[in-house]
């Protein structure tokens, strides 16, 4: 996949970057870190500039996020879970739990989630769906999405440009970072379930405790 990404970017320049980043938002398995860091490297040997690369990547990110936002407005979370539980989920490499996780992040943390989740693998794309389902105001969604993706794009493009031929090193580090984040999110999810079960089915009997003390 990396070779295809590089070919598209070399052939189509800014348009290729915008297109690939847009697809990356809709199809999470496509690695944005490869696109952005190689895009930064491209600025060292081609006519493409860092600012233009960042703008192209940000436009692609926002367009991809908008598509998922409107998908969320049209389809309920339950419907999306059913869709990804079948063949579509295998193609996109998504599970119903991924949709549920993104929804919980949004409902628990509110609008700020749209900004901060742009730095978290997988959820950075899926968080747009619950935002649409919750009928989040489009201007707010656009502002937070643009700011979050802009920062992410600036960092990776500049790193790619600074490292030059060693741009793949960043992609490798971020790939490990993605794996660690997914594991951490899984642990947090399991702990949340355990806490819920404990509070729901094993509540402390305060009355009994007070009676015993008397």
Swiss-Prot record:
A GO term from the CC aspect: plasma membrane
Protein localization: Cell membrane
Primary subcellular site in the record, as a coarse category: membrane
InterPro entries: DedA_domain, VTT_dom
Membrane topology: Multi-pass membrane protein
Keyword hit for Ribonucleoprotein: no
Transmembrane spans: 48-68, 141-161, 177-197
Coiled coil segments of this chain: none
Keyword set, alphabetical order: Cell membrane, Membrane, Transmembrane, Transmembrane helix
Family label: Belongs to the DedA family.
PANTHER family membership: ALKALINE PHOSPHATASE LIKE PROTEIN, UNDECAPRENYL PHOSPHATE TRANSPORTER A
Protein name as annotated: Alkaline phosphatase-like protein
Designated gene of the protein: apl
């Amino acid at each position: 996949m990396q070779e295809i990404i590089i070919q598209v970017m070399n052939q189509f320049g800014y348009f290729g970057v915008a297109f690939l980043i847009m697809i990356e938002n809709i199809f999470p398995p496509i690695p944005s870190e490869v696109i952005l860091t190689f895009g930064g490297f491209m600025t060292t040997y081609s006519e493409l500039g860092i600012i233009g690369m960042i703008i192209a990547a940000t436009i692609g990110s926002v367009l991809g996020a908008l598509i998922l936002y409107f998908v969320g407005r049209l389809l309920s979370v339950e419907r999306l879970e059913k869709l990804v539980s079948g063949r579509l989920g295998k193609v996109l490499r998504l599970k119903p739990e991924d949709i549920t996780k993104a929804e919980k992040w949004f409902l628990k943390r509110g609008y700020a989630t749209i900004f901060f989740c742009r730095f978290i693998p997988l959820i950075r794309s899926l968080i747009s769906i619950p935002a649409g389902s919750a009928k989040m105001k489009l201007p707010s969604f656009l502002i937070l999405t643009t700011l979050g993706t802009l920062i992410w794009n600036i960092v990776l493009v500049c790193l790619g440009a600074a490292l030059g031929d060693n741009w793949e090193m960043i992609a490798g580090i971020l790939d490990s970072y993605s794996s660690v984040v997914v594991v951490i999110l899984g642990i947090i999810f399991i702990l949340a379930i355990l806490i819920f079960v404990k509070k729901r089915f094993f509540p402390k009997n305060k009355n009994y405790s007070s009676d015993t003390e008397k």
